[in-house]
A protein has these predicted regions:
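Internal alpha/beta scaffold segment
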Residues: 149-155
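An amphipathic alpha-helical core segment
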Residues: 145-146
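A contiguous pocket-lining binding segment that forms or flanks enzyme active sites
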Residues: 129-134
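Extracellular structured ligand-interaction cores
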Residues: 137
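N-terminal strand-loop-strand beta-hairpin
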Residues: 1-125, 157-190
Length: 190
């Protein structure tokens, strides 16, 4: 199983990071709008074992092309950065994938939008993320912690602490702390 290694950093403003990426000659990949549907068993067995099951649709803002994936994430490994085994496959339909998981007795426990701008720098993927209620994050994913740290330093983000909690955990905590029962989190209509 492939290993996902990443550093997630909370930032106030994405503009300085975007500017730094441009100045460093990073490759712009695209702007995307994602919908992430998170599934678990009725008794929350995946969550209890620090595992995840997600169906994601990602729409390219420019071309409107859409990709849908189903992803299983294994438990996080201990270390300075977030790393975990990940298996992902492309599927034809978000609706069909969610229906299939429901037929297999998985329950959708959360759905949230994310705006993502994707870049490549130093052999790493750099994602500039905006999430409703949670704010702005930079995710740097690479083949090794060393490669990620190098990109983090080159973006002047070395002083930012790494957030090891997944977006799912951050969003669930936000909703629970506020007594929110609606688990479908979207950006306000514009």
């Amino acid at each position: 199983m492939p290993l996902e290694i990443e550093a997630k950093l909370k930032v106030e403003d994405l503009a300085p990071v975007r500017s730094r990426l441009q100045n460093l000659g990073a490759k712009f990949v695209g702007d995307f709008r994602e919908v992430n549907a998170i599934f678990d068993t009725e008794d929350r067995a995946l969550l209890a074992e620090d595992k995840g099951l997600r169906v994601r649709t990602s729409r390219d803002a420019k071309t409107q092309a859409e990709i849908c994936t189903v992803t299983y994430k294994g438990p996080r490994k201990h270390g300075a950065m977030k790393s975990r085994e990940e298996t992902e496959m492309i599927v034809e339909s978000f609706d069909a994938a969610t229906r299939l998981l429901q037929q297999l007795k998985f329950t959708q426990i959360l759905s949230f939008e994310k705006r993502r701008q994707s870049w490549e720098l130093g052999g790493c993927k750099v994602e500039l993320d905006q999430l409703p209620h949670l704010g702005n994050f930079v995710e740097i994913e690479g083949a090794s912690e060393r490669a990620i740290q190098k990109v983090q330093q080159s973006l002047d983000l070395g002083q930012h602490p790494i957030v090891k909690t997944a977006y799912v955990g951050l969003m669930m905590t936000y909703l629970q702390d506020r007594g929110e029962s609606d688990r479908m989190v979207r950006f306000p209509a514009s």
